[in-house]
């Protein structure tokens, strides 16, 4: 008698809890003091011609249709996360005031939830919020930075670099991985 035993490993599920672009362009690499450039960066942030919506829309589409396939886990349906009452009622620690909120462009119904060095309270509380449905939570954002280009004399070109940060936390709010990709 020949018997076969098949073990089916259930794929983990993850909730994407942030998806935003940071409109405050970093300028440290230019080597110019912040007092000279901060006004220009704020003017750029507030300029309606500096429209990051199409870029964020394209990144969102690519992320969910292409990039997500490379993850070793499945993503919960987006609407079940961002449109849920518990997500909409979630109030992150270090919530943004109206002035600081201008720095971020959230995609759709996503909220800005700080993740990082001082974000432990947010990471743990939002992970626990989805612990019944998901094995973890994913924070996704795009940052921009000016870089020095080619220069002669006192003139130079400036390039802009886009960097995405993707950070995964388990259902306890412990970091599994985080990476930045240009």
Predicted ranges, named:
Residues 1-12:
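Bacterial Sec-dependent N-terminal signal peptides
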Residues 2, 122-125, 148-150:
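Short alpha-helical segments and helix-capping/turn motifs at coil-helix boundaries
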Residues 10-24:
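Short N-terminal segments immediately surrounding and downstream of signal-peptide cleavage
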Residues 21-23, 82-85, 144-147:
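Solvent-exposed loop/turn segments at secondary-structure junctions
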Residues 27-28:
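Short, solvent-exposed loop/turn and secondary-structure capping segments
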Residues 31-139, 171-179:
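N-terminal segment of the mature soluble domain
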Residues 136-139, 148-182:
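Amphipathic beta-strand/beta-sheet edge segments enriched in Tyr/Trp
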């Amino acid at each position: 008698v020949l018997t076969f035993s098949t073990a089916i490993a259930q794929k983990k599920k993850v909730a994407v809890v942030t998806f935003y672009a940071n409109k405050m362009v970093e300028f440290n690499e230019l080597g110019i003091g912040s007092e000279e450039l901060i006004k220009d960066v704020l003017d750029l942030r507030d300029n309606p011609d500096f429209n990051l919506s199409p870029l964020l829309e394209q990144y969102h589409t690519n992320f969910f249709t292409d990039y997500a396939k490379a993850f070793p886990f499945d993503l919960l349906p987006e609407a079940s996360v961002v449109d849920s009452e518990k997500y909409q009622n979630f109030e992150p620690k270090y919530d943004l005031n109206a002035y600081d909120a201008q720095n971020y462009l959230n995609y759709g119904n996503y909220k800005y939830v700080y993740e990082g060095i001082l974000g432990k309270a947010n990471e743990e509380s939002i992970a626990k919020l989805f612990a019944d449905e998901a094995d973890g939570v994913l924070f996704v954002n795009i940052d921009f930075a000016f870089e020095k280009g080619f220069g002669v004399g006192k003139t130079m070109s400036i390039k802009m670099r886009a960097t995405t940060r993707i950070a995964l936390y388990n259902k306890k709010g412990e970091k599994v991985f985080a990476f930045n990709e240009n």
